[in-house]
Design a protein with these regions (language model features):
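C-terminal output helix
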Residues: 108-117
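Receiver (REC) domain active-site loop signature in two-component systems and cognate sites
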Residues: 59
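Active-site beta3 strand of CheY-like receiver
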Residues: 48-54
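Acidic catalytic/metal-coordinating carboxylates
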Residues: 37-40, 63-66
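Two-component/phosphorelay signaling modules centered on CheY-like receiver
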Residues: 14-33
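Short, conserved "switch-loop" micro-motifs in signal-transduction and mechanochemical regulators
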Residues: 86-87
Length: 124
């Protein structure tokens, strides 16, 4: 990878954040920050302006869809990958309507995550 790609992970699950961080860092990406909920994720995005955000949909305080909406309003070119549990089709459709770039389904598949992140990074 020629230049550093900075990624923000937004998820209320400590386990999910750890798995994603390990997976992303093993691919050469830099995780610049983690957030526990959508509100914190939005504030960290605003402060750090990472190249890409992974955002869980279901979180306390502010969900991922609301945070996605705020991020896209602030920066329409932001790259946001939504993380969802299987069976959340309605929420996936809503996130796409609000500007989500892609989806990753839990449990994480290393090849799927790598392919999606690489494709979005190359679009920048």
């Amino acid at each position: 990878m020629a230049e550093t790609v900075n990624i923000l992970i937004v998820d209320d699950s400590r386990t999910s954040k750890r798995i994603l961080r390990n997976l992303l860092e093993s691919q050469g990406y830099t995780v610049v920050a983690e957030a526990e909920n959508g509100e914190e994720g939005y504030l960290k995005y605003k402060e750090l302006r990472p190249d890409l955000v992974t955002m869980d949909i279901t979180m306390p305080k502010m969900d991922g869809i609301e945070s996605l909406t705020l991020i896209k309003k602030l920066d329409p070119n932001a790259k946001v990958v939504m993380i969802t549990a299987a069976g959340q089709k309605e929420k996936m459709v809503e996130a796409l309507k609000r500007g989500a770039d892609e989806f990753i389904t839990k449990p994480f598949d290393q090849e799927e995550v790598s392919t999606i992140i690489k494709r979005l990074v190359e679009q920048q």
